[in-house]
Every structure is written in C-alpha cells, then in structure tokens.
Design a protein with these regions (language model features):
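Extracellular carbohydrate recognition and processing domains
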Residues: 117-152
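Short carbohydrate-recognition loop motifs
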Residues: 49-72, 126-132
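Secreted extracellular polysaccharide-interacting domains
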Residues: 65-87, 115-119
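Extracellular beta-strand ligand-recognition surfaces/modules
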Residues: 138-177
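Intrinsic-disorder/low-complexity, polar/charged segments enriched in Ser/Thr/Lys/Arg/Asp/Glu/Gln
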Residues: 61, 76, 89-93, 135-137
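Beta-strand acidic-aromatic groove motif in beta-rich domains, primarily in extracellular
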Residues: 101-113
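Extra-cytoplasmic beta-strand recognition segments
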Residues: 80-104
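Extracellular carbohydrate-recognition regions
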Residues: 1-48
Length: 178
C-alpha cells in the first residue's frame, strides 16, 4: 500500500493512474473481473468466452491483447475514482495516448454509483487508436449532463472496448476535474 499525497477532487483517480504508470507486471485476462493493480481492473462479460493477456511496464502503461467469441456484452478497463465530488467542477476530462496495430475504437464513460445502483455518463467523443501513437482529449461539460450526480459513493472511469478482438497499448492516461 502506498500513501496518496495528491490533493483535489480527482486525487483518488490520479493516484491510481500514477500507481499504474509505475507498475510492472503481467497477467491473463478471462471473463469476469481481474485486478491489474490497486484501483485498476479489467471487467469482461462473465457469460462470454474471453481470453488474453495484459502487461504493464515503464514503456507502456498497459498493453492489452484480448480475444472474445460469441455475443460478448462488454470488455472494459476500470479506474476507481473513489467518491469524486463534482459540486465545484465545471468539466471532467481525460487525456489518453494510445497505439494499436490496427485502428480500434474505445468508448469512455464516467460511472457514478450509490450502493448497487449506478449511472453511466459517456464522453461525447469516441477514442480511436491507430498504428502510430496518438492523443485523445475529451471533456464532459457537467452543466449539460443533468443525469450525472454531482455526489456519488463511488465512481469509475471506464474504457469500453469493442466486442471481439482487442489489441491496444495505452501509453498514458490522465484525468482532471476543473
């Protein structure tokens, strides 16, 4: 366990991403939920046939290789944001750098939960990863998102990957609430 000395409403999420950038390890991906590092996990449809590997190193924040067959409902990367309070924020945003051997799209979402109930709020843009490193910047205008609760018991930043084969390297991921 490491100490989080970051401040601000988004400190919990920024700390989890900082720890992922420093993490070096690998593991297998199967259906269900799989911890990558503290506060970061992969979630795949438990009813689907999903297999793959992930690897994190100093050169690549997270490299994913997944294969899913059948009617896969979701394949996703979750970053826990704690109880991120958005009362004083105007926007919530992300900056992601990625690369993929073939173009692939990823939908980004802020999930806000209270108990077992949650609300998904999707960012307006779709992230596209190419065969050369690219940067994706997206912001969610909180005033134009009335279904997004300003306060929640827990929140996750979720990257929803397309169903089927996923081959993607996340070079860096940053988030901010301002």
């Amino acid at each position: 366990m490491h100490d989080n000395i970051l401040i601000g409403p988004d400190a919990h999420g920024r700390f989890n991403l900082q720890m992922l950038r420093a993490f070096e390890g690998a593991g297998s991906i199967q259906r269900g939920k799989h911890k990558v590092n503290d506060g970061v996990y992969l979630s795949c449809d438990p009813d689907a046939a999903v297999a793959g590997r992930y690897e994190s190193s100093s050169a690549n924040m997270l490299q994913l290789r997944m294969q899913a067959s059948g009617n896969t409902r979701w394949q996703a990367l979750h970053v826990e944001l704690g109880g991120l309070c958005l009362h004083q924020a105007a926007v919530f945003g992300i900056v992601a750098r990625s690369v993929a051997p073939a173009s692939i799209t990823t939908r980004l979402c802020l999930r806000s939960g209270n108990g077992d109930h949650f609300v998904d709020s999707f960012f307006p843009k779709t992230m596209v990863s190419f065969n050369q490193a690219s940067t994706h910047l997206d912001v969610m205008d909180l005033s134009s998102n009335p279904d997004l609760p300003k306060q929640a018991e827990w929140r996750d930043l979720i990257l929803f990957f397309r169903s089927g084969e996923v081959s993607l390297t996340l070079l860096d991921l940053r988030l901010f609430a301002v």
